[in-house]
């Protein structure tokens, strides 16, 4: 690396930029080898960047229809960059005196995503869980990867007409993952910091919490149960809070395979966040009237309805 620094030409940078595999099957993509790289080259590291994909659609591979509802999509065992492993690398990085680590490229399924999976409601739930898992692990940030060509995992697609340089662009689709991105931004707004959460359940439910600079607590509940047997409610115990407002992330029929563009039910399917939707939008603006149900606590307990295949952000102002 020092020999590269000594060349002295090209774009001036604080340190050389390298991109290495995050897959455990690669000779350089093992946890031990990556730790050795960090330790050996710490003085040259400006940013430690890894990639993550939950699944694989490359070379004809396919994932199960409900893949993004599974824990395997959150923590892919062959990716050293997975949330439940990256803490080991971050510890080595911090010991070496470096703190800037990022998931510089990630999405649901590698090689443009998978039709019927990456472009359905389950991708919104996956993104929320994945992003909050990385926040808990301590990474500085994440970059959701997208491409200009047609793909299934891109938040948006666009159409264009005309010729260079006078193209006219139009909105093609807003995919379900974008709802997850918006919900994630709500959780992290206003300099929010993570709070510890203790969850007791046998269901496929995840919980994350933050508190922002205005003293608002937000609890994210994600129910990845796939059938009505997973319907129910969550009792949240927290003292010192006011009435809670609910931002519900819902889809028609609680169907993980639905989107704003499917017709799995009569009249078509719709995703809503806080009662609003992008379905029918021609310019990217959200449609409909916002609806935020209120939950009044009983003592220190809040009862939050949580149907299967859904998520909700519970906002509670602290007194």
What is each residue range found by the language model?
Residues 49, 103, 143, 218-221:
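Structured core elements
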Residues 300-318:
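Extended hydrophobic packing segments that form well-structured cores
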Residues 201-242, 246-256, 309-312:
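Carbohydrate-binding surface patches
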Residues 52-54, 107-108, 148-149, 223-226, ...:
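Glycine-rich beta-alpha junction loops
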Residues 1-130, 137:
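Noncatalytic carbohydrate-binding groove/subsite architecture in carbohydrate-active enzymes
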Residues 241-302, 306:
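Acidic, Ser/Thr/Pro-rich beta/coil linker or hinge segments at domain junctions
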Residues 46, 132, 140, 217, ...:
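Residue-level detector of short, conserved catalytic/binding motifs and their immediate flanks
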Residues 103, 107-207, 213-214:
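Aromatic/acidic polysaccharide-binding cleft in carbohydrate-active enzymes
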